[in-house]
Amino acid sequence: MLNKKDFLKYASTLAFPIMLQNLIGTLVNIADTVMLGYVSQTAMSASSLANQYTFILFCLYYGMATGTSVLCAQYWGKGDKKTVEKILGLAERISLIISLVFFVISFTMPTAIMKIFTNSPETIAAGSEYLKVISFSFVFMGFSQIFMSALRSIGKIMLPSVTYIVSLCVNVLCNATFIFGLFGLPKLGVTGVALGTVIARISEVLICLSYSLRSSDVRFRIKYFFAKSDILLQDFIKIATPAVINDVVWSFANSAFAAILGHIGDDMVAANAVAVMVVNIGAIACRGFANATTIIVSQELGKDRIDTAREYGKRMLTITFIVSLIGCAVILAIRPVILNFYRDKLTETAIYYLGIFIIMTTWRFVGEGINTCLICGCFRGGGDARFGMIVDTIFMWLVAVPLTFLAAYVFKLPPVWVYFVMTLDEFEKMPVVFIHYFRNKWLTNITRDFE
């Protein structure tokens, strides 16, 4: 077992590249939001609401990536490279099927999707065009997300970082080109942002495939993409399915929050879009350490070091909490800068909401960081994805969403207080999460012996 100083160095070598990847992902969203701010508030709101649909798909990918990551990390810790590649092929096949389903729905029924989130005709029209174009990115996004999660799980974290950097550059360049009509091209507005995302996702896949062809570590192999392995499929489903359900339940709840805000008014939607973007910056560090927890715990369990996995999980929880507090301070420090930047881009009411929303969302991501470290890091890394599914289903859909709905439409509270009720969701489930953590039933070695 590493001493605390060496462990911090080890955890940092895993967490910092993940933080960089999260930062780049956030910067992509920032670039989209900032550039759309130059188009119109309607375009910004349309993109934000349309992305609630893609966010559901991303949560499916995240759940599948969790199954991939946990299994790959444990088998890598055991030293079974062949099984790691089989898991990758299996996950990519499932990802492709889901991507195609979401593509067909968003390409053929974009208007119906947008009407779920808003009743503004202008926002519906702009969001529908956005969805039709961005749907072409789904297959590419699924492949790259699964492939890079497998690499991260075995400690190969540089390629995902490089891939995200290239993707960011491609996305920003394409956004600028299509939004502002550079190089003689027409101005495409919100559609241009979607097209830029498609091109960026294609670049990610090209980098992943290029690495796979040359790699001596883990490769994507066509034979494993089509290979049948009932045992691995069973194990993958056992971990990935609860994780997928967990993330879909969580994402649907966030979509329900967005729908509630959307029906209150575009000012709420625009302010929330910027507030979420800002908070994601502050949450990057704590989420990086939380995600590193999965790798660390899984690999130790794959080596059958139960006590070490338990101790490392405890250390990662402490680190994540401290880092989340630092993130709070960063968000509050940059709040005046954000308000000044958007003052001439949003309505006066939206700016008023934004100033309050930024403060409210800071405490939410502290709770999110702790819960993510435990539910997605410790519990899933230990093979227990079922608990997160149960606790999120109960607390999001029987507590958080109903309370927010009641605040908005029954008690008709002012919009700011509706938002406050919405930000309490992470703390409502935290006591139950800690009880499960201290029981230590989540520590499990799930590897098998294959010939």
Where are these regions (language model features)?
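Helix-terminus/linker motif at the lipid-water interface of multi-pass membrane proteins
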Residues: 23, 27-45, 114-121, 177-188, ...
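Short runs within selected transmembrane alpha-helices of multi-pass transporters and secretion channels
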Residues: 65, 134-153, 160-168, 193-208, ...
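Small-residue-rich hydrophobic transmembrane alpha-helices
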Residues: 44-107, 141-160, 258, 271-335, ...
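Small-residue hotspots at the loop-to-helix junctions and early N-terminal turns
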Residues: 41-52, 127, 131, 266-281, ...
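Short alpha-helical transmembrane segments in multi-pass integral membrane proteins
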Residues: 1-15, 72-137, 185-241, 297-364, ...
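Transmembrane alpha-helix boundary and packing residues in multipass membrane permease domains
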Residues: 18, 22, 33-34, 70, ...
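Generic alpha-helical transmembrane segments of integral inner-membrane proteins
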Residues: 19, 23, 27, 31, ...
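Transmembrane helical elements of multi-pass membrane transporters/channels
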Residues: 13-32, 133, 144, 167, ...
